[in-house]
């Protein structure tokens, strides 16, 4: 009987179960969206039990629709929206509050207090991260400070904390395993990425009892088995876990030092594998753990662009320039250039390397001759310019020359964007045959742990190229265009 790996891709707006075969090919995808809660401006929450319900639903759909029996699943891998925080009662299994999502800014005041107390350097030195509401630690503190009775329960050892991977493993194992992996732990603001353990000083700063925290395990590891009543009477190994961006790096087979992937989703997330050394950034990048596997931990540099695919959605829904996001390519290629127009899509501030939350979106270079085509092209070009900002920072910090950029995510189907990306970077861009690299990464991690795949070299051989975009632009034109972008960003930042 043929065996498969099931990957659970628990994202910000939907949960998906993707079944992969031994060749790393997709056999079936099941997806279910769930509700977003916005209780106050800037707050984003999920119901953790609704997420759990969506997981059970997609597992059932994936197996029934594909005709695969539960006993044919050799292992389960989990990849998840990172930083999103769940706190639950360890006796009842009931969350004490909604899951606070990575995007949510409700712990901004806590972050401000930590900065005012001078903790920035300590936190940066130990975690590789910035003090920002984005990360889990201040979200946990917010729950303990604002939910009645929560702090007392936590001090008594009755509450558990977890990122989404921890919550799902706990639920799937029937409460037997309270664990996380190195990649998810490294996003909490509480984990020392050098000592590889929860840091007592950081826990003290945040006021989080150690008893709440999950045990940290490798990213490729059998954590527990599913309880039979959650998996059609079968005990299946839960064998891999990684945060979504780290899973994508693994799914792209970026196993060697200096290999880089960029995911074009709502925003862009670029990660560079830096091997067994954690590089401290001088250019606004985060230092993070890529994964723990084969008895060692490997690190990555990470850069975040806040607005990428959402800029294309803005053209479609806000400005009504087209009805389908795919049409953006058709309009962009009609214009020979952006004709001096620059769009700075800083709708929620700018991420790496600027970290400027006060700047807002701006458009420069408009003339009477500017057309819809110019505007659409300029918006797409902005995604490529922002990616160059991040890659340049990575090259500066690492001292590693980048030979190629591997790409994934929804926007990579846009050939114009990928072409321009290669041109402006002066680096070839490689688009893989399988675009579901996040789910594939967690499947690989689980498959390695249960012996479904033998080693990373077998996985590396499975990576297949769909298209390679070679840079063709002259150096002079590249410099001129990018200088214009930098001027536009500076002007937008001056307008506050």
From Swiss-Prot:
It is an enzyme of class 2 (transferase). CDD domains: FGGY_EcGK_like. GO terms for cellular component: cytosol. It holds the Pfam family FGGY_C. Its EC number is 2.7.1.30. Activated by phosphorylation and inhibited by fructose 1,6-bisphosphate (FBP). The phosphoenolpyruvate-dependent sugar phosphotransferase system (PTS), including enzyme I, and histidine-containing protein (HPr) are required for the phosphorylation, which leads to the activation of the enzyme. It catalyses: glycerol + ATP = sn-glycerol 3-phosphate + ADP + H(+). Pathway: Polyol metabolism; glycerol degradation via glycerol kinase pathway; sn-glycerol 3-phosphate from glycerol: step 1/1. The keyword ATP-binding applies. One of its GO terms (biological process) is glycerol-3-phosphate metabolic process. Sn-glycerol 3-phosphate binds at residues 12, 82-83, 134, 244. ATP binds at residues 12-14, 266, 309, 313, 410. Belongs to the FGGY kinase family. Homotetramer and homodimer (in equilibrium). This is Glycerol kinase. It comes from Bacillus licheniformis (strain ATCC 14580 / DSM 13 / JCM 2505 / CCUG 7422 / NBRC 12200 / NCIMB 9375 / NCTC 10341 / NRRL NRS-1264 / Gibson 46).
């Amino acid at each position: 009987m043929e065996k498969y790996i099931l990957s659970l891709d628990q994202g910000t707006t939907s949960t998906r179960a993707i079944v992969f075969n031994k060749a790393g090919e997709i056999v079936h995808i099941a997806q279910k969206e769930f509700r977003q809660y916005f209780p106050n401006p800037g707050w984003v929450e999920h119901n953790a039990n609704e997420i759990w319900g969506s997981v059970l639903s997609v597992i059932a759909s994936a197996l029934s629709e594909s005709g695969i029996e539960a006993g044919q699943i050799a292992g389960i891998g989990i990849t998840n929206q990172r930083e999103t925080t769940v706190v639950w009662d360890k006796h009842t299994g009931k969350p004490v509050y909604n899951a606070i999502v990575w995007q949510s800014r409700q712990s901004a005041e806590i972050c401000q207090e930590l900065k005012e107390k001078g903790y920035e350097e300590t936190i940066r030195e130990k975690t590789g991260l910035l003090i920002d509401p984005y990360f889990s630690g201040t979200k946990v503190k917010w729950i303990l400070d604002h939910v009645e009775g929560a702090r007392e329960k936590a001090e008594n050892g009755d509450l558990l904390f977890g990122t989404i991977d921890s919550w799902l493993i706990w639920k799937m194992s029937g409460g037997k395993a309270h664990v996380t992996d190195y990649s998810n732990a490294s996003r909490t603001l509480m984990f020392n990425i050098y000592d590889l353990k929860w840091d007592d000083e950081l826990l003290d700063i945040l006021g989080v009892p150690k008893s709440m925290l999950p045990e940290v395990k490798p990213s490729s590891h059998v954590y527990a088995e599913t309880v039979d009543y959650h998996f059609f009477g079968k005990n299946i190994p839960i064998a891999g876990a990684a945060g979504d961006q780290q899973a994508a790096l693994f799914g792209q087979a970026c196993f060697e030092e200096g290999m880089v992937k960029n995911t074009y989703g709502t925003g862009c997330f670029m990660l560079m594998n830096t091997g067994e050394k954690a590089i401290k950034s001088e250019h606004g990048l985060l230092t993070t753990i890529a994964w723990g596997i084969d008895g060692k931990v490997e690190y990555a540099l990470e850069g975040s662009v806040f607005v990428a695919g959402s800029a294309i959605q803005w053209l479609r829904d806000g400005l009504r320039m087209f009805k389908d996001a795919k049409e953006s390519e058709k309009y962009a290629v009609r214009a020979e250039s952006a004709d001096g127009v620059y769009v700075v899509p800083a709708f929620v501030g700018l991420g790496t390397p600027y970290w400027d939350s006060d700047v807002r979106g701006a458009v420069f270079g408009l003339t009477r001759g500017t057309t819809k085509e110019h505007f659409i092209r300029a918006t797409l070009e902005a995604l490529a310019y922002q990616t160059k900002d991040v890659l340049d920072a990575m090259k500066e910090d690492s001292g590693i020359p980048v030979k190629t950029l591997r790409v994934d995510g929804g926007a990579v189907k846009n050939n114009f964007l990928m072409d321009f990306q290669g041109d402006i970077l002066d680096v070839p861009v490689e688009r893989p045959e399988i675009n579901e690299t996040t789910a594939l990464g967690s499947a690989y991690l689980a498959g390695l742990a249960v012996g479904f795949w033998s080693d990373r070299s077998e996985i590396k051989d499975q990576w297949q190229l769909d298209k390679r975009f070679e840079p063709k632009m002259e150096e002079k034109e590249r410099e001129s265009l990018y200088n214009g972008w930098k001027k536009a960003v500076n002007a937008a930042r001056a307008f506050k």
